[in-house]
Amino acid sequence: MNILPSVIIHLLENFRPLMRVEVFETFTLLLTGLLVGEAKHGTVRSSVFAPADYQPARISDFFTTHRVSPQKLMAKLTDLVLRLRYGGTLPERLFWIADSTHTEKPFAERIASLGLFHRTKRVVGRAKHLKGHCYVCAAHLYQHLDAQGQMRWVSALCGALLYVKGRSIPALVGQLAAQLRLPEGIRHVWIVDRGIISRPLLRALEALSQFALGRVRANQVVYFAPRRQPKKGRKKTYGQKCRVDQLLRRFPDRLRKQRSELHVQGKERKIEIYDAEVLLRGVRKGRALRARAIVVIVPGLKKLKPWYLVTTDLELEAIAAVRAYAGRAQVEVNFDEAKELGLGHYQGRSGSGVRRWAVLVCLSQALLKLAATGVIKLDLPKLNWSWYKREETVGQLRRRLIEHCRPRISRTMSAPRTV
């Protein structure tokens, strides 16, 4: 029973070559349950949309028995997002966000990859450590023209990997970048935060001919190229070194200053941008990695500390890099949307099920985000709420989709046989 709009059903057909016929039927039912809200409280509840001869046990088989490749699903989802957003002509540079998030399962036992993680925000009545899963997610960052006629950064999830002991998050980001199978001939820039940008990540991205843009700590040491070489002996690889928080004080003559405006703390503010080409040490054995160090200062906010950014894409302008990094916060919006869809509600215990469930949630969030930004055109009824005027947010679009589907809570039984 296909209750979803025909546009979404047509888009799901792109995933049919990745699985068998009976598996694709279960895949469609799970996506229907996720979008409508039934699968959030139990995957087997997606079988209410199935015909009478469908066995609900096949829902569990999708996560454990059937041969479904999460890597192929993520690669196909990435290709679908790029094709819907840009058509046949891709821009010369694409931005991607990588970050990690946690799902809390305080009473779970004997579930694959369940661990204790440091709780980033204090919750009254909860322990300092969080028991649950950690996911490393990737999202495509692009600009969208909103209802007010302004260009805004938005992002759509394209894949997720499950954190396991023995693997670092930067290494998982590099693995995720390889599994997305991004198109060649395009400059792909990965935007990460201070806890992820590191030498293992830079090595992994360099092997893929991709680039990184991230915020570094104030004590990050960078090097300048040597200005003078000795007449005899070995050539110098590195020149003077300096911490990024001391660049303005020690080497103001080597920095290029620019002025621009950026949306900071709720309003447009003037910012000062200082950048210089530097060298990073330890990424490649015996060789330096060229990068650009960027210092961002907001003069109107005296208590706001400067931002220290580093990018390995030397062709990316400093102002464009700062604006792109400002869009990194969109991944937090994606995490809220994914958790609302049920990222932490999967009740299975197998590792394959935990991994596949995260990919299905990413697919559902990407479809809703593309529809909310007008990339996917859906004819859905409006709710006309007096207390909430916006109809194109992801949450409101999902409620409109539920109103359109009006799912039945009982299954259609076959007619009894007559003798």
Say what each PLM segment does.
Residues 31, 35, 44, 59-63, ...:
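Long, contiguous hydrophobic alpha-helical segments, chiefly transmembrane helices and signal peptides
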Residues 31, 64-151, 279:
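Active-site-proximal, Lys/Arg-enriched surface segment
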